[in-house]
């Protein structure tokens, strides 16, 4: 198959096992690497389940596997749970955000003194892309290291009903959330012995579980991807990881940047471009990005650039709208 232009619209990449999960466990039925394929039968007979991660993926797994007498332990670096959506829409917040990560953090803290934090974060989300584009590489790294956990739990929220169910599980002891880092796992017959280091401590704690579920979410390090197409692109130099390793490096038009220059006719869209645009997973953001890319590809075809000389004269906005 030949094409004048190719757009990589792969969405979120499948999760990879976190450090601490050894090969023996990875190949065992006592471990679920991809929770999006998790079925209730996988947990049949399990009383104690370790969930690696504490975000929305963990919540989905815990609620779907919840049974009388079953206990869950959720382990994540910071032990933070997603916050909940409001039952009624809050008063909108409209003030602009500007500056580096520290400046924006101060502005958010000040804004939440007079407005519902949800409204503040909703407005911040719409400002995230231009803010990210204006930050230096050092500022982006600082955000990822220090502020991303807070961003994630406020940005990716629970429905009010799910929040009630999770807090009920916490209150009843069905669910325990721990802050720490998984250090090792050992298969022991029909159970798994796991060791983790609590946050701020050196000595590990051990526990025994009947099932371990990877709930760390979509793959966040492009070099770890087992997607054959991604591996081939990187191997042949058609593309390269972005400086933060979040996805593939692209220019402002979404073209992949190879070993030394943009690759004409090869584009990426969505989470693969997170290193360049950061907030690029919600439908409104994807729709806007798709429209921009469609217009660019159509214009390149009209002018004979990027090897796309014979593109049909279709309105790119109609393509994005599905008309």
Each predicted region: which residue ranges?
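Flavin (primarily FAD) cofactor-binding/catalytic cores of flavoenzymes
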Residues: 1-99, 106-302, 316-323
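Short, highly charged C-terminal tails/helix-capping segments
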Residues: 311-312
């Amino acid at each position: 198959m030949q094409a004048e232009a190719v757009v990589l619209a792969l969405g979120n990449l499948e999760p990879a096992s976190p450090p601490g999960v050894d090969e023996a466990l990875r190949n065992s039925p006592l471990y679920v690497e991809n929770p999006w394929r998790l079925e209730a039968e996988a947990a049949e007979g399990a009383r104690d389940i370790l969930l690696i991660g504490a975000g929305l993926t963990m919540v989905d797994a815990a609620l779907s596997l919840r049974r009388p007498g079953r206990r869950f332990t959720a382990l994540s670096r910071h032990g933070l749970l997603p916050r909940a959506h409001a039952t009624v829409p809050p008063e909108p917040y409209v003030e602009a955000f500007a500056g580096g990560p520290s400046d924006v953090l101060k502005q958010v803290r000040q804004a939440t003194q007079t407005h519902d934090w949800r409204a503040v974060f909703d407005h911040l989300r719409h400002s995230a892309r231009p803010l990210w584009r204006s930050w230096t590489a050092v500022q982006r790294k600082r955000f990822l290291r220090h502020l991303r956990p807070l961003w994630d739990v406020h940005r990716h929220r629970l429905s009010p009903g799910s929040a009630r169910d999770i807090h009920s599980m916490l209150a009843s002891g069905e669910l325990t959330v721990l802050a720490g880092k998984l250090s090792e796992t050992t298969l022991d017959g029909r159970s798994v012995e796991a060791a983790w280091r609590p946050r701020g401590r050196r000595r590990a704690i051990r526990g025994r579980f009947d099932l371990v579920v990877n709930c760390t979410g979509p793959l966040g390090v492009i070099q770890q991807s087992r997607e054959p197409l991604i591996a081939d692109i990187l191997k042949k130099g058609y593309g390269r990881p972005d400086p933060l390793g979040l996805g593939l490096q692209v220019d402002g038009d979404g073209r992949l940047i190879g070993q030394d220059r943009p690759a004409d006719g090869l584009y990426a869209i969505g989470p693969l471009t997170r290193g360049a645009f950061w907030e690029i997973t919600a439908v409104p953001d994807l729709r806007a990005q798709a429209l921009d890319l469609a217009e660019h590809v159509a214009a390149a075809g009209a002018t004979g650039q990027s090897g796309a000389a014979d593109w049909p004269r279709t309105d790119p906005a109609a393509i994005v709208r599905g008309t």
